[in-house]
C-alpha cells in the first residue's frame, strides 16, 4: 500500500527467517553498502540500534540537490526541537537493528505512510541503546512530493502532541521527553 508497508514486509520476512541482525537501506545504491560492516560492528558492540548519519564526521550528502539537503537538515532540526532528539540525522533511511527491536517494529502500526517513518521510528527508539554510523548518501531525485511533506508534518505534530500529553504508549514502551 505504501513505503512503510514495504519496509515492514521486508523486516517481517527476515524476522520469520530467524535472523538476529537487520540492516535497512534504500535500494538503488543511494546508500553506500560499504558502510554495512560499520553497522554490524556497532550492533555487535551492544547497541540495539545503529542509525546512519550524513551529518556526523565521516558522513556526506554527495551530489544531492540543495532542496534535498535543506529538507533533511530542516527535518532533523524540527525533530530535535519538537521531539527532543539528540541524533544528528533524523531522516536517514540507513539503519540496523537487533531482533528484539525488529519484533517491536513489525508489531507497531506506524502513523507515517511515507519516508518520515524513519523519523517516527527513531523517536520511538530513543530510549534504546544506539550509536550513529557515518554514511554517504547520493540522492536519486531532487523532488519530494507535497503528499510526503504533508504526511511528515502531520506525523511530527501528532508525535509532539503525544509527547506533550504524557507520552506515546505502544510496543516501544512509553516514549516522552
Predicted regions and their residues:
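Active-site catalytic microenvironments for nucleophilic, acid-base chemistry
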Residues: 13, 17, 124-127
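Short, intrinsically disordered, charge-balanced linker/junction segments flanking boundaries
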Residues: 21-22, 40, 46, 120, ...
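Residue-level detector of anion-binding/catalytic polar loops
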Residues: 20, 48, 129
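Acceptor/aglycone-binding surface of glycosyltransferases and processive sugar-polymer synthases
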Residues: 1-16, 33-115, 140-155
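Short beta-strand-to-loop acidic/aromatic patch adjacent to the donor-nucleotide binding site
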Residues: 19-30
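Hydrophobic helical membrane-anchoring modules
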Residues: 84, 107-177
Amino acid at each position: 500500500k505504501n513505503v512503510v508497508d514495504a519496509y515492514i514486509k521486508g523486516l517481517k520476512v527476515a524476522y520469520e527467517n530467524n535472523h538476529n541482525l537487520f540492516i535497512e537501506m534504500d535500494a538503488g545504491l543511494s546508500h553506500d553498502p560499504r558502510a554495512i560492516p560499520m553497522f554490524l560492528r556497532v550492533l555487535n558492540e551492544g547497541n540495539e540500534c545503529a542509525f546512519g548519519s550524513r551529518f556526523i564526521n565521516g558522513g556526506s550528502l554527495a551530489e544531492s540537490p540543495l532542496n534535498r539537503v535543506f529538507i533533511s537538515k530542516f527535518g532533523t532540526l524540527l525533530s530535535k526541537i519538537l521531539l527532543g532528539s539528540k541524533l544528528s540525522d533524523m531522516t536517514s533511511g540507513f539503519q540496523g537493528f537487533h531482533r528484539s527491536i525488529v519484533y517491536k517494529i513489525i508489531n507497531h502500526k506506524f502513523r507515517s505512510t511515507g519516508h518520515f517513518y524513519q523519523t517516527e521510528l527513531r523517536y520511538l527508539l530513543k530510549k534504546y541503546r544506539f550509536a550513529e554510523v557515518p554514511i554517504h548518501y547520493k540522492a536519486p531525485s531532487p523532488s519530494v512530493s507535497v503528499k510526503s511533506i504533508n504526511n511528515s508534518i502531520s506525523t511530527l505534530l501528532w508525535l509532539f502532541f503525544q509527547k506533550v500529553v504524557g507520552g506515546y504508549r505502544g510496543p516501544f514502551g512509553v516514549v516522552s521527553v
